[in-house]
Amino acid sequence: MAKSVRSSKKKVKRVVTDAVAHIYSSFNNTIVTITDRQGNALSWATSGGSGFRGSRKSTPFAAQVAAERAADMALEYGVRNVDVLVKGPGSGRDSAVRALNVKNLKVTSITDVTPLPHNGCRPPKKRRV
């Protein structure tokens, strides 16, 4: 019996020179997503997915490692210039931006897009430890 031969087309990676880096830094984790201008994700990494667990996920070093991993994957698409959108109150905000700069990505602008309520929902009660 003859084997059926399948011709598979290789997926062509598109070249994107300008991108947007979305950095979401919470108190527990840091998520770095690099998208094109339309918002289609090119690469992403988290500090939890980078091998950090527990309280080490929320450290600036974990955010730096996550940003470096996301930048390495984005460089395969030919990304050179990056606008940075930073969201959240976490400790990994600055170190993630610095890590993108070190990876030969030219940071063109840094914008803080943290949502602030105009006295909306009631916040959770304070912790008593």
From Swiss-Prot:
Give any Gene Ontology cellular component. ribosome
PROSITE patterns referenced in this protein's UniProt entry, alphabetically: RIBOSOMAL_S11 (PS00054)
Gene3D superfamilies per UniProt: Ribosomal protein S11
Q: Which InterPro entries match?
A: Ribosomal_uS11, Ribosomal_uS11_bac-type, Ribosomal_uS11_CS, Ribosomal_uS11_sf
Record keywords: Ribosomal protein included? Answer: yes
A UniProt-annotated Pfam family: Ribosomal_S11
Question: Molecular function (GO) terms listed?
Answer: rRNA binding; structural constituent of ribosome
List keywords of the entry alphabetically. Ribonucleoprotein, Ribosomal protein, RNA-binding, rRNA-binding
Spell out where the chain crosses the membrane.
none
- A single GO BP: translation
* Keyword Nucleus listed: no
Which domain of life does this protein belong to? Answer: Bacteria
What does the record note on quaternary structure?
Part of the 30S ribosomal subunit. Interacts with proteins S7 and S18. Binds to IF-3.
Q: Which NCBIfam families match?
A: PRK05309.1, uS11_bact
Function, please? Located on the platform of the 30S subunit, it bridges several disparate RNA helices of the 16S rRNA. Forms part of the Shine-Dalgarno cleft in the 70S ribosome.
Q: Which PANTHER family match?
A: 40S RIBOSOMAL PROTEIN S14/30S RIBOSOMAL PROTEIN S11 (PTHR11759)
Q: Which family does it belong to?
A: Belongs to the universal ribosomal protein uS11 family.
The name under which this protein is listed is: Small ribosomal subunit protein uS11
Protein's organism: Francisella tularensis subsp. mediasiatica (strain FSC147)
